[in-house]
Amino acid sequence: MLVPTRVKHRKQHRGRMHGKATRGNVITFGEYGLVAMEPAWITNRQIEAARIAMTRYIKRGGKVWIKIFPDKPITAKPAETRMGSGKGSPEYWVAVVKPGRVMFELAGVPEEIAKEALRLAMHKLPVKCKIVRREELEGGDANEN
């Protein structure tokens, strides 16, 4: 499970998700990618489920890169607790994903296998996604600065 080893502050504000992703919106490592089409919080369990689905399908070949990390703590109060008495304790971690963010990358497998593996991962995530090739994303060359 992906969780930060140390954090400066245990609790965070929820924040807002405005606009499109300005970073992490190009394929840098792999040949195929899974791009988010809408904003969402993606939990560490969802990321892990998508990773397992992809790696099981591609079996031994290929390499998978996870481009998002759950670094935002989400707090929750116990059920049937009265209002007040402070903020709840951290329950799980999420990655904040904006539209256009490349979440997973895949390389070293044929196109049909890559697309099917990413499609399986798509079903594990709470966002609409699209599968893209490196050439389809503008500025998709890893050597561009």
Curated annotation (Swiss-Prot):
CDD domains registered for this protein in UniProt: Ribosomal_L16_L10e (cd01433)
Alphabetical GO biological process terms: translation
InterPro entries attached to this UniProt entry: Ribosomal_uL16, Ribosomal_uL16_bact-type, Ribosomal_uL16_CS, Ribosomal_uL16_dom, Ribosomal_uL16_sf
Entry GO terms, CC: cytosolic large ribosomal subunit
Keywords (A to Z) from UniProt: Ribonucleoprotein, Ribosomal protein, RNA-binding, rRNA-binding, tRNA-binding
Domain of life: Bacteria
A Pfam family matched in the record: Ribosomal_L16
Gene3D superfamilies on file: Ribosomal protein L10e/L16
A molecular-function term among this protein's GO annotations: tRNA binding
SUBUNIT field: Part of the 50S ribosomal subunit.
Family classification: Belongs to the universal ribosomal protein uL16 family.
Name of the protein described by the UniProt record: Large ribosomal subunit protein uL16
Lineage of the organism: Bacteria, Bacillati, Bacillota, Clostridia, Eubacteriales
